[in-house]
Amino acid sequence: MMPKTIITPPGSGTPLAPFSPGTLADGVMYVSGTLAFDKQNNVVHIGDAAGQTRHVLETIKSVIETAGGSLDDITFNSIFLTDWQHYAAINQVYAEYFPGDKPARFCIQCGLVKPDALIEIASVAHLPR
């Protein structure tokens, strides 16, 4: 079995389910699906897709930085949104966090684990060794 390192940023809350915020294996960082939760797993920025997107990307940034990387190391994002009406607001914030070369990604509409959550993002990054 390939050695892996569990990545949990300092001050993180306890996940709702049995998973880690991030896993690093062989230079590849996998960031779990991330929602706009506070440390008690309450949704923040209710009704605000841009605010939730910013919160999610800041959380992902924290996980990757804890492992020694940066958002520039992200190669793929999986984006889940509850309604296409939020697509423009999400993309506006997303572009602020990825101003240069953009990672590959997909975006689908679906239900999320909490009704007030509007967006979830999972990421893959390749960290420098």
Swiss-Prot record:
First-level EC class: hydrolase
Q: Which residues cross the membrane?
A: none
Q: Which domain of life is it from?
A: Bacteria
Q: Which reaction does it catalyse?
A: (Z)-3-aminoacrylate + H2O + H(+) = 3-oxopropanoate + NH4(+)
Keyword field contains Transit peptide? no
The Swiss-Prot or TrEMBL record annotates one GO molecular function as: deaminase activity
Give a Gene Ontology cellular component term annotated to this protein: cytosol
**InterPro entries in the record:** RidA_CS, RutC, RutC-like_sf, YjgF/YER057c/UK114
**Keywords from the UniProt entry:** Hydrolase
In the Enzyme Commission scheme, what number(s) does this protein have?
Answer: 3.5.-.-
Q: Name one GO biological process term.
A: nitrogen utilization
What family is this protein classified in?
Belongs to the RutC family.
Q: What does this protein do?
A: Involved in pyrimidine catabolism. Catalyzes the deamination of 3-aminoacrylate to malonic semialdehyde, a reaction that can also occur spontaneously. RutC may facilitate the reaction and modulate the metabolic fitness, rather than catalyzing essential functions.
Q: What is this protein called?
A: 3-aminoacrylate deaminase RutC
Species this protein is from: Yersinia enterocolitica serotype O:8 / biotype 1B (strain NCTC 13174 / 8081)
